[in-house]
């Protein structure tokens, strides 16, 4: 059922994540189901439709695209969720303004080895806590409930708290006595894992395209979700894990 609230439009639907962790679609013009949104930074008026309950479907692709938002070009990670009704793309920046890996991308990487691609998932960003301006910057990814009265099953993160080679942040103190954190080792490790999955999805989708081309003219068959990928360590030796 894709978006757990009805999402009007064609077969492709595009979503962003706000600073407060809201999953939303936006429009420059008024639309049914969209509410006026005024940017606190610029005062610009747009129209948002928020999807509080996330996106449901099969994780069918992850890729990196260069996009132009408000005249600024940047690389975005596009997370593609698919079901029988269409495709749903969640776009988040690949990098931070300081040159690190975006926290949503690292959050996705933490889950990837444990996601069974043959099962429907639900993906939803964590929302900002009451009184906080910004969200923590991570996703919740669960297996979708199988019955209307069932419950989603939260997927365990494969990489967390130094497990499976995931480096902790490195804490230090500047000359003024203020604490600061270095994420270089963590970002390097996360990006190596991320690149492996980009290649896996690319290879699988190319294979699917070839099979689709060979089957032109044949009796159509129902599409099946992509196979689950076996967990592999990064191709390069990961940086050491640091204890806080």
Q: Where do the PLM segments sit?
A:
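OB-fold ssDNA-binding interfaces and closely related basic DNA-contact patches used
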Residues: 1-95, 100, 105-113, 128-176, ...
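Intrinsically disordered, low-complexity repeat regions enriched in Pro/Gln/Gly/Tyr
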Residues: 214-244
């Amino acid at each position: 059922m894709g978006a757990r609230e009805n999402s009007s439009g064609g077969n492709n639907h595009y979503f962003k994540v706000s600073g407060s962790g809201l999953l939303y679609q936006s429009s420059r013009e008024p639309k049914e189901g969209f509410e006026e949104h005024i940017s606190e930074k610029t005062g610009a008026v747009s129209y948002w439709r928020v999807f509080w309950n996330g996106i449901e479907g099969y994780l069918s692709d992850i890729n990196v695209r260069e996009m132009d938002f408000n005249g600024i070009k940047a690389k975005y990670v596009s997370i593609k969720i698919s079901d029988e009704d269409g495709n749903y793309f969640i776009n988040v920046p690949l990098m931070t303004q300081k040159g690190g890996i975006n926290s949503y991308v690292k959050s996705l990487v933490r889950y990837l080895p444990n996601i069974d691609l043959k099962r429907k998932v639900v993906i939803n960003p964590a929302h900002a806590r009451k009184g906080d301006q910004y969200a923590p910057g991570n996703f919740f990814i669960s297996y979708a409930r199988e019955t209307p009265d069932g419950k989603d099953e939260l997927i365990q993160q494969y990489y967390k708290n130094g497990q499976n080679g995931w480096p902790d942040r490195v804490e230090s103190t500047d000359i003024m006595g203020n604490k600061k954190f270095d994420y270089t080792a963590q970002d390097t490790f996360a990006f190596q894992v991320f690149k492996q999955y980009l290649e896996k999805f690319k290879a699988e989708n190319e294979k699917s395209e070839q099979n689709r081309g060979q089957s032109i003219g044949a009796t159509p068959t129902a599409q099946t979700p992509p196979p689950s990928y076996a967990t592999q360590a990064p191709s390069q030796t990961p940086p050491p894990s640091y204890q806080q």
